[in-house]
């Protein structure tokens, strides 16, 4: 994660929930990838560099498992072809929808992210 605020939030969540096997890296450049142990699972916030991110991760671990997060339908629609291209199978897509009430007891929708999973067998 290259956004400092988002990275800080992720690091706070790792500490708060006691998840000690999570490493947040600033980017997927070759320099960053060289500094980390071989991951078995990656959680990616999808962006315009998703294909390059997948390529770099598969170079580090050809049997990688993926979890991809996006709010954008156009990104979601492009993931299946990418998974097919790189031999990533067992694709599952899940959308999480949360609503809460405001002070007037009115429902307020929250962002409804898509989580897409897949793995190279």
Regions found by a protein language model. Name each.
Residues 118-121:
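C-terminal lobe and adjacent flexible extensions of AdoMet/dcAdoMet transferase-like proteins
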Residues 56-112:
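C-terminal substrate-binding/active-site "lid" region of AdoMet-derived donor-dependent transferases
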């Amino acid at each position: 994660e290259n956004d400092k605020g988002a990275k800080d939030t992720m690091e706070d969540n790792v500490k708060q929930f006691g998840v000690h096997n999570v490493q947040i890296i600033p980017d997927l450049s070759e320099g960053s990838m060289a500094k980390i142990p071989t991951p078995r699972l990656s959680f990616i916030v999808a962006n315009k560099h998703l294909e390059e991110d997948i390529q770099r991760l598969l170079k580090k671990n050809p049997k990688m498992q993926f979890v991809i997060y996006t709010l954008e339908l156009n990104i979601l629609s492009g993931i299946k072809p990418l998974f097919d291209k790189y031999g990533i199978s067992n694709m599952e897509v899940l959308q999480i929808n949360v609503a809460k009430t405001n002070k007037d007891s009115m429902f307020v929708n929250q962002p409804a992210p898509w989580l897409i999973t897949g793995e190279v067998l």
